[in-house]
Swiss-Prot record:
Heterodimer of ArnE and ArnF. Residues 1-3, 66-76, 122-137 are cytoplasmic. The gene is arnF. This is Probable 4-amino-4-deoxy-L-arabinose-phosphoundecaprenol flippase subunit ArnF. The chain crosses the membrane at residues 4-24, 45-65, 77-97, 101-121. Belongs to the ArnF family.
Length: 137
């Protein structure tokens, strides 16, 4: 059950971090450049999107801490890599982001997904490896 909690927390962290990236991109693309902040009134929706994205990052961090409690770092961290693929696919699919698909980017996303699957593939039952910090019985 603890492993399931870890996987759910890692998935939550990945989804929240991805939403945060998209929200920040959308909001920041609608705000004026910092040097123009004094002379312009920022768009409220853009400010709200950035604020919600920061909150999503905070929630993502809490999920990440829960994931680390229950999963090995190597497995949990690979799911964060999947968020890069998810952000690209969503940004290229949604018209609000004006991103495009390309063969090289799709190949890169495929490699990231393949890496995540490889890291998280179940190992066959083998003799447990000796760990140098553990004493033999």
């Amino acid at each position: 059950m603890n492993a399931l909690r870890g996987w759910l927390a890692a998935l939550g962290s990945m989804l929240l971090a991805s939403a945060a990236q998209l929200g920040m991109r959308w909001g920041m693309s609608r705000l004026p450049l910092p040097e123009a902040w004094a002379g312009q009134t920022p768009e409220r929706a853009a400010l709200l999107a950035v604020a919600l994205a920061v909150a999503a990052y905070a929630a993502s961090l809490l999920c990440w801490l829960a994931a680390l409690r229950h999963l090995p770092l190597g497995r949990a961290y690979s799911l964060l890599s999947a968020s890069y693929a998810l952000v690209y696919l969503l940004a290229a699919s949604l018209p609000a982001f004006d991103e495009t698909f390309s063969t090289s980017k799709i190949l890169g996303v495929g490699l990231v997904v393949l890496g995540v699957l490889t890291v998280n593939a179940r190992r066959t039952a083998a003799a447990p490896a000796h760990h140098p910090s553990r004493k033999a019985p």
